[in-house]
């Protein structure tokens, strides 16, 4: 059993005690592993100096497997047993896999997740991904000279719970301890240092081999808010290769291609695409299995014409994501490019023209996500170089809560809870037909929201219209080992969800925490009195709102004398609610509630009669 090295706050373990952790970008086309060495994050290459590991696994009849470049080279002659782009299948059933007819694989529609038939038996996407992760783990341990304590693995922002869990399962199968799953756009932002005091709106344009993602981030002193996401899960660099193949077939007048020749031309197309990132033209030479030969020259201008519609296809989700976030291109402070496909000059020009600025490209787009993950892994492992001022949290220093009606604070995670920790609580709507709910995230020990520290606000929209109190909104607070708070709100009927990520202790030193705690202790009695007052006022408002709607709908059930009596009690409650005596408000609420019991009974009778109107007794049996 490995023992963890614990050091005093402000001190760092000695170099020989440094805990080795890595960041892994498990990509659709390529995967990478990176680590922080001597305070510098860097991608770890293989024994031939290659930083990328193709995300390709070929299964052998002997039961073994080839991974990476060797498997990629064998894909042309053994397409059925060579699994490419397995990330597309993670956590997905057969019906969820896009363009399944264009793949050479034999699928098995197993419960929960699709499986693939190979000569080595039926394999799940989790097992295939585990082969890639195990190769990266071995590369890291060989390079760093010791075992890893864990890894931060990146996933697309749009990955759902099933896909995230599948990624964790693959890591476990590969012998990796997952310190955290990190969203790819957040990792890219961390790599560019955008978490260190940067503020403003940033866009992360991620064009990978098989998918396109756009994320609009709002950074405000440690808060990473994903304002909107978009993209196309079936659009990537592979589609640009496909356009070149179609052009080659047309120009050379080729017959329908076999699977082997298709794979050959796709490899040639990919090489041509990469060459055109730095050259004006390139030659495409190939000998097909039919004996046909190909010799063509592809210019950068022709390539741009062939792929213009694909470029525009990426810009549409960008515009939509900006609209969803409620911002314009002028509001965007910087654009981060992620993914090897963003090396194409046509992409960089198009993105630059759309945003009116030069995109951030000083980091390798293939490596930026892995680098950000490595920086996060180094932090979570507890490493700290001289001069670095990392805030290491082992408990929640202050309570985390949410504002409720009346400006009250409902504590979700109490202070001194050990982390990582997750808590959930259900809330409901206050008014009939309410379709949105504002979530105000707070930090502190006081009972009223105005006395606590505001961390973030976001809205949950799309709640189905229901009567007040019928909707169920589950609010979940989760704090990771690095103190990153993720708050999500989910309406249980429709499934609509919204979320935000916050660093709860950003900008708070020990003195600030102590001050906030002391204020909480000193004000406890007064706070409880104010809380009781606010709670009774909320209860009064809720009763008045419900009664107002009931009188509008069924006021004819009351005699003039009964209506006058109720109106008198309503006026008395409104007057009492303006005072400071919470007990008096409670008494007035109880009086009005009891005074309308008979009215409520009559309304129920009317409702039952309406429901039974025109029904025969036999129908009710």
UniProtKB/Swiss-Prot annotation:
The keyword Chaperone applies. One of its GO terms (biological process) is iron-sulfur cluster assembly. Keywords: ATP-binding, Chaperone, Nucleotide-binding. Coiled coil: none annotated. It comes from the Bacteria. CDD domains: ASKHA_NBD_HSP70_HscA. One of its GO terms (molecular function) is ATP binding. The keyword ATP-binding applies. Belongs to the heat shock protein 70 family. Chaperone involved in the maturation of iron-sulfur cluster-containing proteins. Has a low intrinsic ATPase activity which is markedly stimulated by HscB. NCBIfam families: HscA, PRK05183.1. This is Chaperone protein HscA homolog. The lineage of its organism: Bacteria, Pseudomonadati, Pseudomonadota, Betaproteobacteria, Burkholderiales.
């Amino acid at each position: 059993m490995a023992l963890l090295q614990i050091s005093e706050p402000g001190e760092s373990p000695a170099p020989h005690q440094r805990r080795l952790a890595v960041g892994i970008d498990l990509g659709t086309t390529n995967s990478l592993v990176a680590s922080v060495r001597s305070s510098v994050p860097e991608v770890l290459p293989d024994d031939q100096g290659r930083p990328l590991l193709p995300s390709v696994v070929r299964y052998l009849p002997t039961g073994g497997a080839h991974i990476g470049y060797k498997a990629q080279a064998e894909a042309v002659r053994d397409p059925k047993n060579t699994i490419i782009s397995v990330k597309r299948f993670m956590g997905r059933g057969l019906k969820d896999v896009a363009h399944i007819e264009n793949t050479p694989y034999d699928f098995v529609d197993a419960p929960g997740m699709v499986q693939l038939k190979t000569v080595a038996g039926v394999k799940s996407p989790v097992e295939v991904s585990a082969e890639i992760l195990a190769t990266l783990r071995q590369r890291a341990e060989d390079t760093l000279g010791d075992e890893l304590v864990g890894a931060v693995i990146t996933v697309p922002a749009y990955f759902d719970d099933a896909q995230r869990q599948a990624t964790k399962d693959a890591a476990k199968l590969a012998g990796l301890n997952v310190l955290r799953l990190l969203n790819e756009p957040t990792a890219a932002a961390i790599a560019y240092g955008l978490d260190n005091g940067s503020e403003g709106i940033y866009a992360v344009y991620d064009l990978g081999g098989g998918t396109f993602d756009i994320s609009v981030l709002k950074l405000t002193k440690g808060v990473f808010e994903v304002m909107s996401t978009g993209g196309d899960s079936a659009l990537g660099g592979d589609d640009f290769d496909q356009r070149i193949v179609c052009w080659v077939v047309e120009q050379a007048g080729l017959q329908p291609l076999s699977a082997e020749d298709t794979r050959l031309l796709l490899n040639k197309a990919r090489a041509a695409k990469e060459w055109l990132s730095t050259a004006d033209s390139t030659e495409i030479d190939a000998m097909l299995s039919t004996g046909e030969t190909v010799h063509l020259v592809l210019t950068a201008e022709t390539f741009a014409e062939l792929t213009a519609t694909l470029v525009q296809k990426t810009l549409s989700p960008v515009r939509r994501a900006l609209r969803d976030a409620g911002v314009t291109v002028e509001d965007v402070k910087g654009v981060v490019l992620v993914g090897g496909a963003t090396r194409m000059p046509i992409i960089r020009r198009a993105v630059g023209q759309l945003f009116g600025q030069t995109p951030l490209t000083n980091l390798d787009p293939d490596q930026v996500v892995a680098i950000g993950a490595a920086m996060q892994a180094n932090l979570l492992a507890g490493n700290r170089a001289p001069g670095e001022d990392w805030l290491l949290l082992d408990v929640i220093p202050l309570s985390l809560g949410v504002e409720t009606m009346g400006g009250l604070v409902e504590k979700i995670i109490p202070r001194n809870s050990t982390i990582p920790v997750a808590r959930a609580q259900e809330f409901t709507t206050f008014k009939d037909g309410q379709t949105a709910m504002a979530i105000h995230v707070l930090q502190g020990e006081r009972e009223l929201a105005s006395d606590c520290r505001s961390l973030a606000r976001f809205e949950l929209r799309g709640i189905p219209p229901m009567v007040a109190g019928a909707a169920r909104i589950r609010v979940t607070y989760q704090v990771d080992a690095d103190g990153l708070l993720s708050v999500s709100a989910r309406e249980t009927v429709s499934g609509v969800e919204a979320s935000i990520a916050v660093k709860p202790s950003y900008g708070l030193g020990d003195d600030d925490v102590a001050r906030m705690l002391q204020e909480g202790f000193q004000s406890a009695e007064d706070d409880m009195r104010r809380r009781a007052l606010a709670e009774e006022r909320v209860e009064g408002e809720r009763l008045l709102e419900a009664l107002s709607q009931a009188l509008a709908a069924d006021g004819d059930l009351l005699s003039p004398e009964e209506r006058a009596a109720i109106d008198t009690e309503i006026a008395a409650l409104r007057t009492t609610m303006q005072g400071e005596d919470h007990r008096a408000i409670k008494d007035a609420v109880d009086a009005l509630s009891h005074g309308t019991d008979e009215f409520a009974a009559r309304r129920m009778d009317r409702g039952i009669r309406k429901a039974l109107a025109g029904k025969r007794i036999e129908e009710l049996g």
